[in-house]
């Protein structure tokens, strides 16, 4: 049948199964750990900490030690990943068609206008 109403267009969204449907309240705390935004926040965290490590160990020629303020700025990127950040990352991902590359671009945007731009 091809003339059915597309269920994906119904608002509020329809649950895919009982976990995000009738048990949503029970499993809601898991969203911070098992959702796609949680995965992307962890990716941001890993990329930021890896960059801090590379700078601290001078592992890549041309890097320099970061100031305490720069480290704090970097660590704020995953810490401040909120609904607006989730939407921005999704927008970047639509453009790049690559979830991890979108993380890189997201970080780059956050560093625009700072001492770490470039």
Where are these regions (language model features)?
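A helix-coil-helix interface module used to build multimeric assemblies
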Residues: 2-118
């Amino acid at each position: 049948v091809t003339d059915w109403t597309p269920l994906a267009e119904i608002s509020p969204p329809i649950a895919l199964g009982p976990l995000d449907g009738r048990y949503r309240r029970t499993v809601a705390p898991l969203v911070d750990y098992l959702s796609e935004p949680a995965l992307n926040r962890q990716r941001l965290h890993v990329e930021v900490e890896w960059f801090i490590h590379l700078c601290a160990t001078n592992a890549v020629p041309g890097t320099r030690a970061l100031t305490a303020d720069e480290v704090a700025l970097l660590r704020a990127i995953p810490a401040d990943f909120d609904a607006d950040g989730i939407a921005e990352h999704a927008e970047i991902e639509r453009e790049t068609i690559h979830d991890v590359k979108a993380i890189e671009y997201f970080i780059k945007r956050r560093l625009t206008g700072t001492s770490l731009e470039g």
